[in-house]
């Protein structure tokens, strides 16, 4: 039986984060995850998690100046102080709510200086997270949805994980992003399995529910199970209506 995590950055966005956690529990999800929870008091989130018994798998570092086109800070040369403050904030919030992982967002950048900044900031994040037993995640984003994002392929992510050399740095493997950029989702899952810390999914190419599109998720989920993966898979898709009306796939794909 496949277990699923509701990504509350996309699901039940018409509700407060605590109420979205409750909705995910009522719908039969096994875990939750979120994007940027910082506007919600951590105590309210923790209370909803304790009430429902759902684990919070992860959250993202802040993106920076979103209106100005920023999409993360950790690979921006000269912005190390801001990047590390964002990492500290994320780890502090994760500690307060009991979240397992923090996704460190690289940002829109390119070149060797950006690579060096990202490696240094990831080492900082991993050192800080290790003390609390947390995992740091990095995620390649496809170039159609996130043009200019520093990290856009799984190969680049694998190289970064090797360079940083921290045992608690892992790949967030989003089948949607990999499907858009690289294809061969199952082949990449098999090749990268030792590096993966979390798996997400959505239909390719429209990022809708996983019951349609170019990727056959029944096959993908069976392959993931065959790879001895037992953590909940992150449903990070964009509902084409009220979230509760888009959950038929949970029955057919579980």
Task: Give a label for each model feature.
Residues 33, 58-60, 103, 137, ...:
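Conserved beta-strand positions in the central sheet of alpha/beta enzyme cores
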Residues 10-12, 38, 61-65, 106-110, ...:
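Active-site-proximal loop/turn and secondary-structure-junction residues that shape catalytic pockets
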Residues 66-74:
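Active-site gating loops and adjacent loop-to-helix segments of metal-dependent hydrolytic enzymes
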Residues 39-48:
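Active-site-adjacent beta->alpha loops and helix N-cap segments on the catalytic face
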Residues 73-170, 180:
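Active-site acidic/histidine proton-transfer and metal-coordination neighborhood
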Residues 25, 50, 95, 130, ...:
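Anion (oxyanion) recognition and catalysis
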Residues 1-5, 10-28, 89, 98-99, ...:
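Histidine-acidic metal/acid-base catalytic patches
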């Amino acid at each position: 039986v496949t277990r699923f995590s509701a990504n509350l950055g996309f699901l039940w966005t018409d509700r407060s984060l605590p109420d979205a956690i409750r909705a995910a529990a009522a719908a039969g999800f096994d875990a939750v995850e979120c994007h940027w929870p910082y506007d919600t008091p951590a105590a309210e989130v923790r209370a909803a998690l304790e009430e429902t018994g759902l684990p919070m798998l992860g959250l993202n570092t802040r993106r920076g100046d979103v209106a100005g086109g920023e999409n993360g800070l950790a690979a921006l040369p000269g912005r190390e102080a801001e990047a590390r403050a964002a990492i500290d904030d994320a780890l502090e919030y994760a500690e307060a709510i009991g979240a397992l992982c923090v996704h460190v967002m690289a940002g829109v950048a390119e070149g060797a200086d950006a690579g060096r900044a990202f490696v240094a900031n990831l080492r900082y994040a991993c050192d800080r997270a290790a003390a609390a037993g947390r995992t740091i995640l990095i995620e390649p984003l496809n170039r159609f949805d996130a043009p200019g994002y520093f990290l856009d392929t799984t190969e680049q992510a694998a190289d970064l994980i090797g360079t940083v050399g921290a045992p608690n740095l892992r790949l967030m493997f989003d089948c949607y992003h990999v499907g858009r950029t690289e294809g061969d989702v199952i082949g990449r899952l098999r090749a990268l399995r030792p590096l993966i810390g979390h798996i997400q999914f959505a239909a390719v190419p429209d990022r809708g529910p996983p019951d349609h599109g170019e990727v056959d998720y029944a096959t993908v989920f069976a392959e993931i199970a065959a790879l001895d993966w037992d953590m909940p898979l992150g449903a990070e898709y964009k509902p084409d209506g009220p979230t509760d009306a888009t959950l038929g796939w949970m029955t057919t794909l579980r």
